[in-house]
Amino acid sequence: MLANVTRSTSKAAPALASIAQTAQKRFLSVHEYCSMNLLHEYNVNAPKGIVAKTPEEAYQAAKKLNTEDLVIKAQVLAGGRGKGHFDSGLQGGVKLCYTPEQVKDYASKMLGHKLITKQTGAAGRDCNAVYVVERQYAAREYYFAILLDRATRGPVLVASSEGGVEIEEVAKTNPDAILTVPFSIKTGLTREVALDTAKKMGFTEKCVPQAADTFMKLYKIFIEKDATMVEINPMAENNRGEVVCMDAKFGFDDNASYKPKGIFALRDTTQEDPREVAGHAKWNLNYVGMEGNIGCLVNGAGLAMATMDIIKLNGGVPANFLDVGGSATAKQVKEAFKIISSDKAVSAILVNIFGGIMRCDIVAEGVIQAVKELGLDIPLVVRLQGTKVEEARELIKNSNLSLYAIDDLDKAAKKVVQLANVVGLAKENGIKIKIEN
């Protein structure tokens, strides 16, 4: 196993950095204070902190910590908090403080306001909590993560002597500084591998055993809590010669949500796209919002991705990924349209269904219901193939609705891009138009 502890190549580093991003996006993420509480639960050395949801609570938390060295951190599920800004005018979501009064003042400018970072986009995200934490001084900073890696089909340690910065930046500028250690989930993380990794990361001799112990505890969390990612950035040696996890990010497997472990009770849906929450929780629809103007309703994740690709190839930009699955009802299809049309940027919609398990006539019924009941006034291109397709075409024909029924996918994509461009141009100029087939 020790032979597997190798320096990452320039190709592997960006790939593993990408894993970290994907894990956070695909699976449940929890706030920093929840992650830190979990570290304390497993006796991992981490700074003391208290969560607060009002300025007064923040003030009391600062007094309780009883130190003049404090940090207040906005609890928003997005990276780049320190370099972000609030709609209140406050610059930065991580602030050093020296008095409880200063903590209270910063809390009043964070709580109830939106934090805008590179990851949130211009819309920002609501800050409903702050984490007041004791400040610790790092003599050395490292990066450490445990991820699930599809390439090796198991867990992998990703570590670096360059902590406290974005791992993606390290991967770009100095990929040789990243250490990757795949290991078997059957044998788990052994102490031998943990010690060797700590040495290769550059921990001082005194701190190597502490670091290895920390790695083992983090792996225990990873396994027992069904994590897909455990990321510590930075992991530090403080000025007292102790290994401390200064910040933590966890991702958890959505497929484990049925287990009574309490992790999924920590989900903060205010930090998620409400359309994604509604689609998944209420209607079992796999929806991901994007920034384009062409809505997509497709069955099957692969076909959905191919549909987005062909829209892009024809010069359009998808507004969403939406997979209705193989057993959707007409009601679910209608609700899918409701979610898509709630995005004011959508100028046209492409329905692309290949009926295997999914019947085309069911989709057609849902399309007709949606257009009639929701009063959809944007162009709709429908491409249906497969089971019950003739019945579906007959339903659409008899509905007397103004739909574009096109069998060829490339032609359907071209048409929806053309229509979206026309409607988009009209919107920009304040002109209301109605396109009829």
UniProtKB/Swiss-Prot annotation:
Residues noted as binding Mg(2+) in the record, renumbered to the chain: N233, D247
Domain ATP-grasp: 36-278
Pfam families with a match to the protein in the record: ATP-grasp_2, Ligase_CoA
Chief location category: other
GO terms of biological process kind: succinyl-CoA metabolic process; tricarboxylic acid cycle
PROSITE patterns in UniProt: SUCCINYL_COA_LIG_3 (PS01217)
Subcellular location: Hydrogenosome
Cofactor(s) required, per the database record: Mg(2+)
Cofactor remark from the record: Binds 1 Mg(2+) ion per subunit.
Keyword annotations from UniProtKB, A to Z: ATP-binding, Hydrogenosome, Ligase, Magnesium, Metal-binding, Nucleotide-binding, Transit peptide, Tricarboxylic acid cycle
Catalytic reaction list: succinate + ATP + CoA = succinyl-CoA + ADP + phosphate
Domain of life assignment: Eukaryota
GO MF annotation list: ATP binding; magnesium ion binding; succinate-CoA ligase (ADP-forming) activity
Chain segment of the transit peptide: 1-27
Oligomeric and partner information: Heterodimer of an alpha and a beta subunit.
Family according to the record: Belongs to the succinate/malate CoA ligase beta subunit family.
NCBIfam families: PRK00696.1, sucCoAbeta
Function comment: Succinyl-CoA synthetase functions in the citric acid cycle (TCA), coupling the hydrolysis of succinyl-CoA to the synthesis of ATP and thus represents the only step of substrate-level phosphorylation in the TCA. The beta subunit provides nucleotide specificity of the enzyme and binds the substrate succinate, while the binding sites for coenzyme A and phosphate are found in the alpha subunit.
Protein name: Succinate--CoA ligase [ADP-forming] subunit beta, hydrogenosomal
